[in-house]
Structures are given as C-alpha cells and as structure tokens.
Amino acid sequence: IVAHALEYAADRLVITGDLTNLALEPEFELVCRKLREAGLPVTVVPGNHDTYTRGSARERRFEVFLGEFMAGERSEGDYPFIHRQDGVALIGVSTAIPSLPLVAVGRVGEPQLARLGAALERTAAEGLARVIMIHHPVLPGVAKPRHDLLDLGAFGAVIARYGAELILHGHEHRRIEGTLPGPQRPVPVHGVGSGTYLSQKPDRHGAFSLYTVGPAAITRVYHWWNGSRFVA
C-alpha cells in the first residue's frame, strides 16, 4: 500500500484502527517499526482489536507504543486530537473499548463527544477542511448488533450540530459510502476497506482510498487488490 501510495505522491497515510489482532506487545512493536519505515507521515486511531483485552486498555498499549503517530492538539485526555496540515484538520476519535469474546462494540463516550464538538467548532472557525478519523461505522444499519457503535445516535447529534467535511471509518472491511445530516449540508461518510484483508467477495478485497482535498471538495479514488497489485 505504501509503495503504491507513494507513486501518487501521497502526503500522509491515515489508518482507522485495528493495527493489531490481539493487542499484544510484540504486535505493537512490529506495527511501530513498520510505520516508522513507511516513508511518509502516518496518523492512526485505535480499533477494537487494539484494546482487545482489559489489560491492553488498562496499560494503554496503543497510546504507549503508537503515540508518536497521534501527534496533535488536545484539550484533555488522549482523544480527540487534531493534526493540522495544509488546510486540513485530521481529528482523531477513539471508539476502542475492551469487550467480551465475539463482541466488537465501540463507544465514544460523553466527555469525548463534548471535546469533539468543541474541536469541530474551533477548526471550522479556522477555515480548515475537517476530516474525522474513527474506527466504528457511524451510519445507522451498517454494523451488525454486537459489532456496532453504542452511542451512534449521540455521535450523529454532534455532527448534525457542528458538521464536518468528511468522516472516515473502518471496522467493516469493505467499501462504504453514505452521509450524515449536517447543519448546512450532508456530511460524507466513507468506510475504508482493510488494506490486508483477503476475501473471495469482490467488495471485501484489500483496498485503500486516496483522497485529494481541494478548495471546493474532497475527492476519492478507490484502489483495490486484484490478486497481484493494487489498481484504481
């Protein structure tokens, strides 16, 4: 993915969670090393697999090992964080919570939602294109029960009040496109396929999206694995 993205002169690699499987320390060590070798700046947020056990959440392994890839402004706590670059505000939100086996739910939480609203308001006043990074799907009906965002409605209420230019999520391992209501116009929501996922289903092949942020719009080109290479 990185080699292909660099061919298009990508400015930054953005990953919306699940960088590990079981949130084990050796996994995080490997991920950290690979991201440092990427050859371009990286921004990440955690997924449910990155807090797979209560111990990993308690020890804050994701933040300890990958904190350098979440550099940005914070009002308090780890999330949300704001990374500003070339007229864009990347706003990293965490939905990662430990859960029971075979359960993959997420939650933003009221304190983080309040800080997210303030971050969206502040970056809008700066005239930045606001791109939210979040792991769990934020569109109703996309995630099945026991795999969904528990406070999806509350998240949607924040977006309805403050808006955003784009919301990126992961979790579902497939391409998803939709919108959430915003204060002035619908807010695009894009699910990003897993870059390493192998499946017989065409819509679940390994994939990534390349975004261009222009003065009037954000455009997306979808790149997917055809069995031997990534193609647009």
What is the predicted role of each segment?
Residues 29-115, 157-160, 183-185, 209-210:
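Extended active-site neighborhood of metal-dependent phosphoesterases/phosphodiesterases
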Residues 144-215:
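Conserved beta-sheet core of the metallophosphoesterase superfamily
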Residues 1-30, 36-37:
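N-terminal active-site segment of His-dependent metallophosphoesterases
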Residues 12-18, 42-48, 94, 131-134, ...:
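Active-site neighborhood of phospho(di)ester-bond hydrolases with catalytic His/Asp-centered motifs
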Residues 213-232:
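A short C-terminal boundary segment appended to hydrolase-like catalytic domains
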Residues 26-28, 57, 104-105, 112, ...:
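Residues at alpha-helix caps and immediate loop-helix transition turns in enzyme cores, especially N-
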Residues 21-24, 48-57, 98-102, 137-141, ...:
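Active-site environment of divalent metal-dependent phosphoester hydrolases
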Residues 10, 123-141:
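Short acidic, glycine-rich surface-loop motifs adjacent to enzyme active sites
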